[in-house]
Amino acid sequence: MNGNSKVKALPASFYDDFLSDQAKEWLFSPIRGLFPLEKTPGIISLLAGKPAPSTFPFTSLSFTAKDPTNETSETTITIPQDQLAPGLQYSDTTGLPELLGWVTGLQERVHGRKHGRNGVGEGVEGWRVSIGSGSQDLIYKAVAAMVSPGDPVLVESPVYAGVIPMFKHLHCKQIEVPTDAHGIRSESLREKLENWPQGQRRPKVLYTVPYGCNPTGMTATLERKKEVLRLARKYNFIILEDDPYYYLYYGKTVRPPSYFSLEATEPFGEEGDGSDAVGRVLRFDTFSKILSAGLRIGFATGPEALLNRIDLFTANSNLQVSSLTQLITFHLLQSWGYDNFLLHTRKVSEFYRKKRDVFEKALERWLGSGEATSEGRLAEWNAPVSGMFFWFVFKLLIDPTATEEEDSRTLIETHAFANGVLALPGTVFEPNGSKTPYVRASFSLLEERDVEEAMKRLRKTVLEVRKARKQARTKNKRLGTSMM
C-alpha cells in the first residue's frame, strides 16, 4: 500500500467534462440495474429472463494447470456443480464478483493502491475494476466514452497498430507525440500543449503503452513518467495506460512503477504543491500474455465515474464477458494465490528475456557487426527490456549524406517476402500513415534455428537492395555525364 491516508479521489463531477456526446446518451439497463437487488435475503425474484440451470448439460469442469513452484508438476482443478453454476448463467456487467475481488486485490498488492468506492473511508481513492473481453475491448469503450468526433487525442508515435482504426472509426484527430528508447518524449509533449492553438478543443486523453511498447519495445523510465504525469495534471487530461507487457519486464534494474501507482505517490501539482487528488489514470491490463490469449480476459482499473460509463457501453452491447471463462480464470488464480501468480509471471518474463537474447545475438551476427557481416552494420536497434518486439531500421542507403525518405513496406512485402521471411513494416504503426524505414519483428514464437535463418534471409534482402540501388545510382551518374 502507498500508506498515504491523505490521498483522496477527484469527485465524480470532475469527469462530467470528459464524457463524449454519445456516452451522455447511453441508457442504464432497466433489467441489469436491478440485478443486485436479487441478492437481498428473503427476496423472491420475478425479474430476469434467465434460463433454468437445471436444463444445462454441464455438471462439473476439470482441467490441469502447471504448478508455478514445480516445472515438472501439474495441478488438477475441479469445479463442482454448485461452484460451476455462476459460470453457466448471466452475470454482472462489471464482471464475475469472485474474479473482480481477486483482481482488485492484485491491483492493491502490485500497484500499492488502496481500494474503495465513491471515496468513502480514510485514504480511499475512488477506483475500482471492470472486466472486459480482452483489454482492447475496454480501451475501445473507454475512448468511445470520452472522445467525440473531431476531438484531438494524444497518441505516442509509433503507436500500437490496433488502436489506429479505433481512433479513425471514432473520427478522432490523432496528435502524434514522438517516443524514443526512454518512452514518450515529454519535452515534445510539453511543447505541443504549451503552444496549443487558441480556440481549438484541447485533448482529454493520452494513449500510451509504457512497458515493452508494441511496436518499439521501449519501456518508459521513471523520470519520463513523472514528467508526463505532471503535464496531465497541469493540462487536465487522462492517461490511458495500456499495459499488456507489464509482467513481461526483464530489465536489469527495478521495474519502474506504473502510472496508476505513481499518481498516488508522486507529489501533486506542477510545483509539487501537495494537492492530494488522484484519478487521472485509467489503466488496462490483460491475462492474454501471461495466462492465455484465448481466454479474452482483460480488466480496466481507474476512476469509478469512468468505469461506470464503460460498463454502460458493455450493458448496451455485449452485456458482459463470458461467465465461464471468468470462472475458469478465477479458479486457476485462486488455486495459485497471489504469490504463485507473481512467480508464474516472473517465469514468463524470464522466458521472453531468453528469447530476446537469442534474437539479439542473431541480429548482431547477421545484421550488426558480427562475424557474418563484412559490409559493416546493416541495421540499428535498441534492445527491449520488456515485451516481445524488436524495432529496427535497415541501413539501405550507400551514401550516408542521402536524405531521401525510406519506407520499409516495399522492402518487407516484396523483397523480404521473396527471400522467405516476413516482419511488419513500420508504416502500419504510424497514426497518420507517415512513411518510416523501421520494421517490427516479434521474437515470441521462433526457435533459435529459425531466428538464425530469418536473420540470414534479412541480411540477404538488405544486401540485394543495396546492390540494386548502387547499380541504379551508377547508371544514373553515367547518364548524367553523357548528357553534359
Give the ranges of each region predicted by the language model:
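Eukaryotic N-terminal low-complexity, Ser/Thr- and Lys/Arg-rich leader segments
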Residues: 1-33, 191-202, 265-275, 340, ...
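N-terminal "arm"/small-domain region of PLP-dependent enzymes with the aminotransferase-like
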Residues: 2-105, 421
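Short catalytic/ligand-binding loop motif for oxyanion handling, primarily in non-cytosolic enzymes
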Residues: 52-59, 214-217, 247-250, 291-293, ...
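Conserved glycine-rich beta-strand-loop-beta hairpin in the small C-terminal domain of fold type I
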Residues: 345-360, 364, 373-397
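Conserved PLP cofactor-binding pocket of PLP-dependent enzymes
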Residues: 413-440, 470-480
